[in-house]
Swiss-Prot record:
Assembly and interaction partners: Heterodimer of an alpha subunit and a beta subunit. PSII is composed of 1 copy each of membrane proteins PsbA, PsbB, PsbC, PsbD, PsbE, PsbF, PsbH, PsbI, PsbJ, PsbK, PsbL, PsbM, PsbT, PsbX, PsbY, PsbZ, Psb30/Ycf12, at least 3 peripheral proteins of the oxygen-evolving complex and a large number of cofactors. It forms dimeric complexes.
Cellular component terms (Gene Ontology): chloroplast thylakoid membrane; photosystem II reaction center
Keywords, sorted A to Z: Chloroplast, Electron transport, Heme, Iron, Membrane, Metal-binding, Photosynthesis, Photosystem II, Plastid, Thylakoid, Transmembrane, Transmembrane helix, Transport
Membrane-protein topology: Single-pass membrane protein
A GO BP annotation: photosynthetic electron transport chain
Pfam families recorded: Cytochrom_B559
Domain of life (superkingdom): Eukaryota
GO MF annotation list: electron transfer activity; heme binding; iron ion binding
Cell location: Plastid, Chloroplast thylakoid membrane
Principal place of residence: plastid
Protein name: Cytochrome b559 subunit beta
Amino acid sequence: MTLDRTFPIFTVRWLAVHGLAVPTVFFLGSISAMQFIQR
């Protein structure tokens, strides 16, 4: 019962972390690339 309640929370947390981390890394990478191209 305990694992059944903890698993969905872990999944939502994992999805939220990756959903925010992936675009952030992509955004920072594109910004740094633009600055390198301008110079």
